[in-house]
Amino acid sequence: GTLYTFRLLSKICDANGNVIEELTPEGEQIEGISQSTYDVMREGMYRVVHAAGTAAGAFTGLQIDIAGKSGSVQENLSRANHATFISYGPYNDPKISVTVAIPHGYMAYNAAVVCRYIYQYYFGYIDMEDILDKSYNTLGESATYSD
């Protein structure tokens, strides 16, 4: 496959919308991994969202069986960590991959909760009104929200 450098931009424009620079994807060809390595990675990602995994609390009772990996990125000591969560599901027949990155989101759990909403929305368990309703909580716990 191809391993691409992570980028959020495809081009840079001036204030009038004129393209200053096109940013072409940069990638390198990589060799595949062994089946045993793949199996270990897959099992590890499954454990992250189940039982005592680091993101299990965000996915308890989720209607779709998924696998994922949590992560926090430290930029510097004066700002909150970036929160990240990568995932795919359903676990045994993947249809979708979801990645959530929240700049200065404090901890990966916060990204995992957003990820849960995406899965529930994509597979039709909730709709946009549920997501926008601040009293709605997909975690099944009493929730308090403040603006």
Residue ranges of predicted features:
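Short, highly charged C-terminal tails/helix-capping segments
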Residues: 130-147
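Active-site beta-strand/loop architecture of penicillin-binding DD-peptidases
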Residues: 1-28, 42-129
